[in-house]
Amino acid sequence: MADKSDLNALSGRFRGFYPVVIDVETAGFNAKTDALLEVAAVTLKMDQDGWLQPDETLHFHVEPFEGAILEPAALAFNGIDPTNPLRGAVSEYDALHEIFKVVRKGIKDRGCNRAIIVAHNATFDHSFMAAAAERCSLKRNPFHPFATFDTAALSGLVLGQTVLAKACITAGIAFDSSQAHSALYDTNQTALLFCELVNRWKRLGGWPLALEESSLEDTSAED
């Protein structure tokens, strides 16, 4: 069985996965046709006692790709004006290239094998990240192609809430609804929420697992 220091490391906690919190703001629901307008990422780290906490934050306003659909209802919902020059928007390639570079370094520094997206209703964010990476021909995508950690599902289990604002408030995390639907704000709050869910499970005695070494070896042999 791994010693305590390994179980307190990020690589030991999530089976070699490096969790990165992602939130995207978009001009619709179709990842293939609708514009990615904003993306933020928060990397995570463990302290020496195995408590999860936010680490580095990245944030980009993104230029719509050529031919992208801009759904008026989506723009009204998130309040983004894609034509506003004050956004300081960058290309999809530049935004994802920088995020991927930081994530790959984190994977290496933390001794992990691959990154995994953490997001609220994660299928949505994962699909837009994957579609943008494909459009930009970014072949070294560090994120798992389909697995995610979904804080909506985890919050439903732990807190009885699935809406981000309600889950945060129930968990004792402040949430300013006037800042919601900003990728930067939502990512930061989702990161705090995920850390609280993971740390709460630890405080309740759910981690580390009380398994014998032989049981872990048997499971590893089956993988």
Swiss-Prot record:
Its EC number is 3.1.13.-. The record marks 29, 77, 124, 146 as: Important for substrate binding and specificity. The keyword Metal-binding applies. The active site is at residue 181. The keyword Disulfide bond does not apply. CDD domains: RNaseT. Mg(2+) 1 binds at residue 23. Keywords: Exonuclease, Hydrolase, Magnesium, Metal-binding, Nuclease, tRNA processing. Mg(2+) 2 binds at residues 23, 25, 181, 186. GO terms for molecular function: 3'-5' exonuclease activity; magnesium ion binding; nucleic acid binding; RNA exonuclease activity, producing 5'-phosphomonoesters. One of its GO terms (biological process) is tRNA processing. Its cofactor is Mg(2+). Binds two Mg(2+) per subunit. The active form of the enzyme binds two Mg(2+) ions in its active site. The first Mg(2+) forms only one salt bridge with the protein. Residues 20-194 form the Exonuclease domain. One of its GO terms (cellular component) is cytosol. It holds the Pfam family RNase_T. It comes from the Bacteria. Homodimer. Belongs to the RNase T family. Trims short 3' overhangs of a variety of RNA species, leaving a one or two nucleotide 3' overhang. Responsible for the end-turnover of tRNA: specifically removes the terminal AMP residue from uncharged tRNA (tRNA-C-C-A). Also appears to be involved in tRNA biosynthesis. HAMAP family: RNase_T. This is Ribonuclease T. It comes from Pectobacterium atrosepticum (strain SCRI 1043 / ATCC BAA-672). The gene is rnt.
